[in-house]
Design a protein with these regions (language model features):
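A detector for small-residue-rich transmembrane helices and their helix-helix packing motifs
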Residues: 1-217
């Protein structure tokens, strides 16, 4: 079994500290701690229930659901990916545009997941759809950047450098191959539809949010 963990972009230096990305990470951690304290009632109140969205109810959960997570590994993995790709996009777009872009991507991702199971009453949650939006923007803007990555195969661990286009491209292919699965608290599945929807939103709209000079081809 192989695991690949992106650690960050080594091809560029950001002009300023990624304050918004850090704020998003801190908010996710805070909300997760609230989940641990308040339990399942908190999750059901703020997570996306597809059947509710289908009937125009609890639309705020399209945002709040992106800050909920199903466990320690879920939130840890998401925050590592966000910190690997988020700072460069925040630096290129500017803080406010990046924040709006991230939140809108999360909403689009959740809507994609709802579209795949509109009658479900099982909570959908997680930041991965919004993070997929950031990754979509990254592959458009900085495809040649090298991503420092930790590769773990059985007992062998090493750090290597992988072109962003290859790393993100393979990741997206995996999402497409698994797009039939649904992420739920009960099943422990992965929201592949949300990933695909968020990623495509990032790819299509990245140019609209970012000055042309920020792109690196």
């Amino acid at each position: 079994m192989a695991t690949l963990i992106p650690l960050g972009d080594v091809s560029r230096r950001t002009r300023r500290f990624a304050m918004v990305t850090l704020l998003i990470v801190v908010t996710n951690v805070y909300v997760f701690l609230r989940e641990l304290v308040e339990g399942n009632a908190f999750v059901r109140r703020w997570a996306v229930i597809p059947a509710h969205i289908e009937h125009g109810r609890n639309l705020i959960t399209l945002v709040s659901g992106t800050f909920l997570h199903a466990g320690w590994l879920h939130i840890a993995g998401n925050m590592v990916f966000l910190w690997a790709f988020g700072p460069a996009i925040e630096d290129a777009m500017g803080r406010m545009r990046y924040l709006i872009f991230y939140l809108m991507g999360g909403v689009v991702a959740m809507l994609a997941q709802v579209a795949g199971s509109p009658n479900s009453h099982v909570p959908c949650l997680g930041a991965s759809g919004a993070i997929a939006t950031v990754m979509g923007a990254f592959i458009v803007m900085f495809p040649r950047d090298r991503i420092r990555s930790l590769v773990w195969i059985l007992i062998f661990i090493r750090v290597t450098y992988i072109p962003a286009a290859l790393l993100i491209g393979v990741w997206f292919l995996i999402q497409l191959l698994n797009v039939g699965m649904v992420a739920t608290v009960q099943s422990g599945g992965v929201a592949y539809l949300a990933h695909v929807g968020g990623f495509l939103f990032g790819v299509v709209t990245a140019r609209l949010w970012t000055p042309k000079a920020a792109f690196s081809y």
